[in-house]
Regions:
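Accessory alpha-helical/coil subdomains and C-terminal extensions
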Residues: 1-97, 188-195
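C-terminal non-catalytic interaction/assembly regions of soluble proteins
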Residues: 76, 89-195
């Protein structure tokens, strides 16, 4: 991934969807067989002039985990009535929620606000800041603590943008968020993504 090179559009955690061949007479697009199969298996829907499967009033907040992530910021945004929160976790999907040496009280405050969010049934989803690899909350105790808190995202290997769009769609359909986020709706959770 690069901001200005021609290979800036390599797929993340996946294989190319298609290849493009250009000649002086024009170009041809050859889609990958697995993508053709996925397109055939996808549900058909009519083309519309405005969104029909997304509730346009849904609001999803996003935060990036790091030393600047503070509970009062999360609380202020959550108080505006968002329908979901996506956190870009570090490494395997961790958030700064522990204070083992009693020198990071802001982490304990973040843990409290996240617990309140989950208790209010506000979906809190962890995605990965890393370009490659899944969120794996089973490796370290912090990840297991996050799962026990009710934070979602274990096993997610899609990009933050794809997961945010998926959360928006799931909330718009009024279906079970936890089940839908762990399911494969359109190829975002293919096993090959976890390599």
């Amino acid at each position: 991934m690069h901001s200005s090179r021609r290979d800036a559009f390599h797929p993340v955690n996946g294989q190319p969807l298609a290849s493009l061949s250009m000649t002086p007479k024009g170009f041809t697009v050859t889609t990958a067989p697995w993508y053709d199969d996925a397109r055939e298996a996808a549900s058909k829907r009519p083309v519309a002039e405005r969104p029909t499967t997304y509730e346009t009033g849904q609001r999803i907040a996003q935060f990036i985990a790091g030393p600047w992530l503070h509970a009062e910021h999360v609380e202020a945004v959550v108080s505006t009535g968002v329908q979901g929160v996506v956190f870009h976790g570090t490494g395997l999907g961790h958030l700064p929620i522990d204070d083992p040496q009693n020198d990071a009280p802001e982490n304990a405050l973040l843990w409290r606000i996240l617990t309140r969010c989950v208790n209010r049934e506000l979906p809190v989803v962890i995605v990965n800041q890393c370009i490659h690899g899944p969120v794996d909350m089973n490796v370290y105790s912090k990840g297991r603590k996050q799962q026990a808190m009710g934070l979602l995202g274990h096993g997610v290997s899609s990009t933050p943008e794809a997961m945010t769009a998926k959360l928006h769609w799931v909330l718009s359909q009024n279906i079970n968020v936890k089940e839908a986020l762990s399911s494969n709706l359109c190829g975002e959770h293919r096993e090959t993504l976890r390599e």
